[in-house]
A protein has these predicted regions:
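A broad, structural surface signal
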Residues: 56-59, 217, 221, 270-278
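Internal hydrophobic scaffold segments of catalytic domains
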Residues: 37, 41-48, 52, 63, ...
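Conserved Radical SAM active-site core
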Residues: 16-158, 167, 356, 361-387
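C-terminal accessory extensions appended to soluble enzyme cores
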Residues: 2-23, 241-387
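Short, exposed beta-strand "edge-strand" segments with a Pro/Gly-rich flavor and a Y/T-containing core
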Residues: 71-77, 171-177, 275-277
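Alpha-helix capping and helix-coil boundary motifs
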Residues: 78, 211, 330-333
Length: 387
């Protein structure tokens, strides 16, 4: 595989210029001032918001605390405004080799309030960008909606169906579609030729975890090909809400914690990985790895995970076999990436199989480290800074 920053950057500039000439002054202003034009990508990719907020009132969810509301509002950008916002983002790059995109982080993308905007955004992402796209949903999709997915020719689509409980779904997710409808969606997606995954997140210890094997078996029977085993990030409100309905998890969290806390769940995750393999589901510890596998399934391309999970403790040795993919990188591309993204001229560059050693004079701040992570994603190699 060849990883070229200059090719991605040139494609980005050409598309950006085209849309700037096409859109009105007001549309350009909205796009360039929007958060999609400014945010750093997360490990799963750059999150795309087709709505803000959620009214499903899932007991374990932190979204109501982010926005201070339990209702949904469709996102304000048009499809082409979203594309310009992304192309205006210093840390976004187009094409299948570029930035992963993820729907479903702060809303339900296929809720009736959000679905039209979601499909609009998907259409224009496919038309202009062609990036890998992942969505997570609890909502059932009709046949005509699934058929819209078939029209996309450039993006690689990775469908994640969120399902953590059948027995307790009615109290954990009171306003969400029933688990049976989600299993039906998995069947419908497989029938239409797609390769859906079950998104097992959050992983709630004790009572919910006890039925995990049954949930995974039902998802496998419905046609899921793999499972993303997530973590669980809690707040005081979430802990109290769970306690009210009989789910006590205090043993897993420190006393008097403030803000958000991610539970330590390694033994639970390891157990689910083992169970998944036994029943024929491919397990993943992160959504980006499932997206990477979808690229192989959809496009026949073996591209290493954008988040470099194969160099961390997140790799589960899926069929992509990222660690054994040779990535060719040119020194001029590395120099250009540091100049364009960080405004830094490296003193020396040493490109090795899995690492790029960079010598710079400046001490790098926390933000600079995040920018280095962006460059790592382009080249699929760890960057080691030497001073």
């Amino acid at each position: 595989m060849d990883a070229s920053f200059n090719k991605l950057y040139s494609k980005k500039i050409i598309l950006k210029d085209f849309l700037e000439n096409r859109l009105s002054i007001e549309s350009k202003r909205r796009a360039m001032n929007d958060s999609h034009a400014k945010r750093f990508p997360r490990p799963c990719g750059l999150t795309i918001h087709s709505a803000v907020g959620c009214n499903l009132n899932c007991v374990y969810c932190y979204v109501p605390e982010i926005f201070g509301m339990n209702y949904m509002v469709p996102y304000g950008l048009s499809g082409e405004e979203l594309i310009l916002a992304l192309l205006s983002n210093k840390y976004f790059f187009p094409t299948i080799y570029g930035t992963y995109l993820a729907f479903g982080s702060i809303t339900e993308p296929f809720h009736p309030i959000a679905s039209l905007k979601t499909f609009e955004y998907l259409y224009f992402i496919d038309k202009y960008l062609g990036n890998p796209v992942q969505f997570s949903t609890k909502f059932f999709l009709r046949e005509d909606q699934i058929n819209l997915f078939k029209k996309y020719r450039n993006i690689s689509l990775s469908p994640l169906i969120t399902l953590i409980s059948i027995k307790y779904a009615s109290i954990l997710e009171p306003n969400a579609p029933k688990p049976e409808k989600r299993l039906e969606l998995i069947r419908s997606l497989r029938k239409a030729g797609f390769k859906p995954f079950i998104f097992y997140r959050p992983l709630i210890p004790y009572k919910v975890f006890e039925e995990a094997e049954n949930v995974l078996r039902e998802a496998k029977r419905a046609g899921a090909i793999g499972v993303i085993i997530g973590g669980f990030r809690v707040t005081e409100r979430i802990v109290m809400n769970l306690k009210k309905i009989g789910f006590t998890i205090e043993a897993n969290i420190p006393k008097n914690f403030k803000g958000q806390y991610s539970l330590h769940l390694r033994k639970y995750k390891d157990s689910l990985i083992k169970i998944s393999r036994e029943i024929g589901l491919i397990p993943f510890k992160s959504a980006c790895c499932a997206n990477t596998y979808s690229i192989l399934l959809n496009k026949g391309l073996r591209i290493p995970c954008s988040n470099l999970c194969f160099q961390k403790n997140f790799c589960t040795n899926c069929p992509v076999d990222c660690k054994n993919i040779s990535v060719n990188v040119e020194m001029d591309d590395v120099r250009s990436a540091f100049k364009k993204i960080m405004n830094i001229e490296p003193d020396s560059i040493d490109i090795q199989r899995n690492i790029i050693n960079i010598s710079v004079k400046k001490k790098l701040s926390g933000k600079r480290r995040r920018e280095i992570a962006i460059i790592e994603r382009i080249f699929r190699k760890k960057i080691n800074i030497i001073r």
